[in-house]
C-alpha cells in the first residue's frame, strides 16, 4: 500500500508559542535600612551596581514553559449506505451539484466538481475503500489538491491517450489562486465520499465498478436545463441502455478484436451496458475495441474516465467533435492516440535516461574518491 502516499495521513501538528519574557536590566539592589552607630555620623553604604547581561539571551528569570496549542485532525467522512448503485449514482450527482452551488462558486465552473468526482473514481488503489476514504477525508487542503494532481498525472502516465482527453478536468489544478478554491473543493470531496463514490468505483473487479455511470449523473445534475437542451444532452436511463445492448449485440457470434462505435455517446452509458452484456456471456470487454465520440468536451472527458473505471481495456478511442460535419473524428482520434503514446514513451525514456545518467555520475564519483570514501 505504498501508493497510499498519494494522500499522506493528517496528524495533529502542534503549533508551539514560547512565552519568553522581555529582556531587561536587573533592578539595583535595595539600600538596607540604616543601622544606628555610636559614631557621630554613620558611614554611607555603597550602592550595588546593576550587572550587565552576559549575552542577548541572558535572562535572570526562569523561562516559562512552552504553550502547546494542538490543531485537531479532521474527522473522517462516514459514507452512507448506497443500496442500489444506479439510484446511488443519481443521488451522488445531485448531492455534488447542490454542494457546489451552495459553496458560492456557482455553476459556471462545473468542470471543478466533475473533476473531483472523476479523480476519486480514478483513484489507483482499489480494494481498500475504508482506508482511502479515511486518508482523503482527513488530509490537509494542500495534500488534497496535490493528491488530485498526482491522480491525473498517474492517469496520463499509464493512459496518455485517455489522459489527454481529460484535459478539461485538469486545468483548474494549475490555475493561479487554486488554493482559494480549497474550501469548495473540500466540501465537494466530502459530499462525494459521503454518497459512496469509492463504494461504487473502488472495487478491484471492473464488473462491480460498471454498475453505474457517475460521470453522467454528475454532469447532468450540474448542467442547467437550458444548457442540456442546447447540447441535446440527456441522461439515458441505464435500464434502457441494458435493453438496447441485449437487442443489438449478439454476444455468441462476436469475435475477439471486433470494434464498437458510438458517434454521439455522451459519457458512454451504452458502452457500460454493452460491457456488462459481454461479461454476462463470459467475454472480456478488454478483448474488443471501443470508439466513442461526443460534441461536448466535458462529456468526452467523462467517457475517457469511464473507459478506465469500467475496464474497457487498451483499445479505446475517445474523440470530441461534430461527427456529422467532420465525419472522420474517430480516424483522427486514432492518429492522435498513436502520437500521444509515442510522446509519452519518449518522455518516460528521457526521464529514465536522466535518472540513469545521475546514478552513473554518483558511481563515478565514488570510484574516483577511492575505497575510503564510504
Give the positions of each predicted feature.
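Charged, often flexible domain-edge or linker segments that flank or initiate folded functional domains
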Residues: 2-26, 31, 39, 44-157
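Conserved aromatic-histidine-acidic binding/catalytic patches
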Residues: 104-108, 180, 202-210, 232-236, ...
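Long, ordered, amphipathic alpha-helical scaffolds
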Residues: 311, 316-373
